[in-house]
């Protein structure tokens, strides 16, 4: 009998790095644009950025829901134990072979993972 891990957390570090890179661009832009300003103005800019990213995330979540992509990658973190659908290609192909019109396809997996990447990036802000 073999021992099976209850949780596969191996893609977590890669997902955190992707989220950090996504968050770094708007954060650096906001801090660069507001350099030399008072702290309260910097905080206001950070709040506006966070509100914008949250609204953007809600809109992309609606797109994810309307395209029925919520189960494109059914596990968390990652997609079938990988940080992106590229590594989960064989698992997605197997799921499509079993259920061609089912909830798992390559396009749906990418939509779901982009939604997750955006959320991780917003969480870093």
Where on the chain are the PLM-derived regions?
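Extracytosolic (periplasmic/ER-lumenal) interhelical loops and adjacent juxtamembrane/interface segments
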Residues: 1-3, 66-113
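Cytosolic juxtamembrane amphipathic/interface segments immediately preceding
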Residues: 32-36, 107-108
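Hydrophobic alpha-helical transmembrane segments of multi-pass membrane proteins
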Residues: 114-118
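Short, strongly hydrophobic alpha-helical membrane anchors
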Residues: 1-11
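Membrane-interface helix-boundary motifs at transmembrane edges
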Residues: 34-44
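N-terminal signal-anchor transmembrane alpha helix
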Residues: 46-68
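Conserved small/polar residues in nucleotide/adenosyl-binding loops
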Residues: 123-125
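Hydrophobic core of alpha-helical transmembrane segments in multi-pass integral membrane proteins
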Residues: 13-32
């Amino acid at each position: 009998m073999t021992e099976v891990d209850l949780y596969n957390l191996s893609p977590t570090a890669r997902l955190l790095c992707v989220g950090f890179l996504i968050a770094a661009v708007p954060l650096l832009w906001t801090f660069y644009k507001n350099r030399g300003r008072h702290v309260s103005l910097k905080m206001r800019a950070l709040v506006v950025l966070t509100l914008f990213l949250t609204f953007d995330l809600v809109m992309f979540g609606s797109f994810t829901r309307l395209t029925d992509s919520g189960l494109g990658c059914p596990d968390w973190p990652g997609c079938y134990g990988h940080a992106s659908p590229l590594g989960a290609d064989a698992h997605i192909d197997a799921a499509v072979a079993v259920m061609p019109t089912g909830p798992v396809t390559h396009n749906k997996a990418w939509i779901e993972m982009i939604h997750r990447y955006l959320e991780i990036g917003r969480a870093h802000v």
